[in-house]
Design a protein with these regions (language model features):
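Alpha-helical segment of the N-proximal tetratricopeptide repeat
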Residues: 21-52, 79, 83-104
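Canonical tetratricopeptide repeat
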Residues: 60, 94, 128-129, 147
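Alpha-helical linker/edge segments of TPR/alpha-solenoid repeat scaffolds
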Residues: 65-81, 135-159
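Alpha-solenoid helical repeat scaffolds
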Residues: 47, 81-85, 115, 134, ...
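Short coil turns that delineate tetratricopeptide repeat
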Residues: 54, 87-89, 105, 122-124, ...
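Non-catalytic, surface beta->alpha helical segment in thiol-disulfide oxidoreductase systems
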Residues: 1-15
Length: 159
């Protein structure tokens, strides 16, 4: 009973409440669009926010998340993963599979998949694989050991 009174008093004083963070209008627009499943509008809103505030890490993360959602929306993850096993050198399929894996929380397999593919190709194909890896890295905390390891492997593969 005493604990409940303390918690009630604390709440009345605003203690323990989450601070309300101000959001940018573009972010509000993006989130509203996402609620409607409108990935194109959400992506455009985040791009406008990044154009206005180029160092906004939350906007960059939001954009990367929206782009991943758009790429994986409606995909049959199990079929893509099956097909990726059957066609290990199909760049489109492997990139799509990596997206599905990241979306499912399987970061290391996704990174390993693209890193393996990276050394098999050069030129435009290699650039495409590298660019997707960098996009996927942007979805994860840069201090995450899985990202740090994959970034090192990427650098070693390219140089």
């Amino acid at each position: 009973e005493v604990l409940n009174k303390i918690l009630t008093l604390a709440a009345q004083q605003g203690i323990g409440e989450e601070p309300v963070e101000a959001t940018e209008p573009e972010e509000d627009e993006a989130l509203a669009a996402l609620d409607q499943g409108d990935y194109a509008t959400a992506e455009a809103a985040y791009k406008r926010l990044i154009a206005r505030k180029p160092n906004d890490s939350y906007a960059k993360l939001g954009l990367a998340q929206v782009q991943l959602l758009a790429r994986t929306h409606g995909l049959d993850a199990a079929k893509i993963m099956e097909d990726a096993i059957k066609s290990p050198d199909d760049i489109d399929l492997q990139i799509q599979c990596a997206d599905v894996e990241v979306m499912s929380g399987y970061l290391e397999p996704a990174f390993d998949r693209l890193l393996r593919l990276l050394v098999l190709f050069d030129g435009d194909e290699q650039k495409r694989i590298k660019d997707r890896l960098l996009e996927l890295f942007a979805l994860v905390d840069p201090a995450d050991p899985r990202v740090m390891k994959a970034r090192t492997q990427l650098a070693n593969a390219l140089f």
